[in-house]
Structure formats: structure tokens, C-alpha cells
């Protein structure tokens, strides 16, 4: 019987690549997120099942599955959004993470959780190189919210014995990326008739 994985935020750049990877490893893949996906789009990114919904205990339980692995890619992915809409950013990032953790604690304590975090947690660091023990000083609401989510993951791991790995991903690029410096540069070059200077 195939192992089962739940990917929150599976339609996004990171989530869709995670889904494709685990599908290629033979997992039965389940995804949840805010946007709609057609059956064809789901299959293109390696999803067997897609649910358009908020990330909540209730919505995860509606899959009626016990997952071996959960990769929580859901939440806000924009520093700019967090500055313009800090409350909404908090709900997406922190509340969504808490829903996943509570689902695991109460309903699926044997699952392994992978939480992709961000270097925004570390913020600006005067000392180089940055060491793993550096507590960080986030420079944006996005960074603070990711830090709170990391702290929740660490707390649930220590207090309830949940198996959680936090991975801070730096400068992730690849097919399907539609934001960040590389994307912006390529679009400017593609759409410009003049010389592009950065």
C-alpha cells in the first residue's frame, strides 16, 4: 500500500514541486489550498486529490485519511503582503500552522511534518556567517509570523512528541517560479526593447 502525503499550499511554487517529487517516489498525494485546480492541473503537479479550502482541522479531516507525511507549504509567501496586510498574513501563516499541528496532535500523531520556513526569520544579521543557533531579528511581519510558526512547531515537537523538521529555504528557483528577483529580471528583459539595468 502506498504511503500518503498531505501538502498544504500545493498549488504554489514550492508545494507543486513537493507534490511532483513525492508522486515520483510513489506516494499517494493529497493537496489543500485556497485556489481552485482542475483535475488536469492537479495531475500535472502530481496530485491525486485536491481540496480547495482553508487549512483547518476540519478540512484536513474531510480527506478521511491518515497521512504518513505532511509538508506544510501553505501560508503567506510575501513580505510585501505582510506589510500591507499584517493581520491577514498572521492568519494565513500562524493560524494555518496551528491548525496543522493540532490536527497532528489530536488525530495523526505518527505523521512526520516538514515545515518549509524562510530566512526572513533571521532578518538582518550583523555577524557573518549566520550560525544555526542565531535567534534572529525579523525585519518584517512576514519574518515574525514565520518565526512564530517555527516556535509553534518546536513547542509541539517538544511537548507532544510530534516528529517535525523545520527547513529554512534560501533563494529557491526553478520552473514555475513567478516572483522574486530572477523572475522579475527575466520578465523585464523579455518585455523591454531597451537595455535593462539592475
Model-derived regions: residue spans:
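NAD(P)-dependent short-chain dehydrogenase/reductase
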Residues: 127-128, 151-198
